[in-house]
């Protein structure tokens, strides 16, 4: 049985996880390349990959990514995986927003909704966490295995970290709701009358 305070804490944690997921999608900082310039007139070079944007300090612009020229030849599997990450992260946000609506229904509903609502909310949080975790893992795999990230200077950047923290919070929140439902006693329920007293 879960109480309002448990759902309230879960709501705040889910809001934080959703904000981090949205920030990781919006910021073009999944993978970054930084190299300092050499010599008197050397300029530093910075490149950052977002899920839908590629920013480059040499041109000073950001462009849509991946484009057709990014996906020719051996890069096809990279582009396919990168687009999959974009889809999975968008799907995770949709699930997290559905969970926030679920919290509103459970918190504004009665005791029966609080008694049963944890099943739906924790299940959706697990799915959202697993989806974000898969996205994080695909980007880490591409970082380790794709040739474009072979030169020194590449690193996993802040959006990847936000994604990692977000799915961790989602999974831990789901586990907390499940644990509270199992461990906490019934909330304000009727006391049973012993059979011998009637």
What are these regions (language model features)?
Residues 24-86:
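A surface-exposed beta-alpha-beta supersecondary segment
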Residues 1-32, 81-143, 163-185:
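Signature of small four-pass
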Residues 30, 39, 43-51, 120-122, ...:
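Individual transmembrane alpha-helices with interfacial aromatic-anchor signatures
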Residues 1, 47, 182-198:
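Intrinsically disordered cytoplasmic terminal tails of membrane proteins
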Residues 59-60, 171-173, 197:
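Low-complexity, flexible helical/coil segments
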Residues 34-41, 104, 112-113, 148, ...:
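Short alpha-helical interface elements
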Residues 1-3, 46, 67-88, 147-163:
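Juxtamembrane membrane-interface segments at transmembrane-helix boundaries in membrane proteins
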């Amino acid at each position: 049985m879960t109480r309002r305070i448990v759902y309230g804490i879960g709501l705040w944690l889910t809001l934080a996880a959703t904000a981090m997921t949205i920030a990781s999608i919006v910021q073009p900082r999944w993978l970054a390349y930084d190299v300092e310039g050499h010599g008197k007139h050397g300029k530093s070079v910075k490149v950052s990959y977002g899920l839908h944007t590629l920013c480059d300090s040499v041109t000073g612009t950001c462009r849509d990514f991946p484009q057709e020229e990014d996906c020719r030849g051996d890069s096809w599997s990279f582009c396919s995986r990168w687009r999959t990450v974009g889809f999975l992260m968008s799907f995770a946000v949709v699930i997290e927003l559905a969970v926030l609506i679920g919290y509103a229904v459970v918190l504004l509903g009665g005791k029966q909704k609080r008694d049963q609502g944890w099943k739906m909310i924790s299940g959706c949080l697990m799915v959202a966490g697993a989806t974000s975790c898969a996205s994080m893992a695909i980007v880490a795999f591409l970082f380790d295995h794709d040739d474009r990230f072979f030169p020194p200077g590449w690193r996993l950047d802040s959006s990847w970290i936000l994604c990692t923290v977000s799915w961790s919070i989602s999974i831990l929140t789901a586990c907390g709701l499940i644990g509270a439902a199992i461990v906490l006693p019934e909330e304000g329920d009727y006391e049973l009358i012993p059979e011998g007293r009637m």
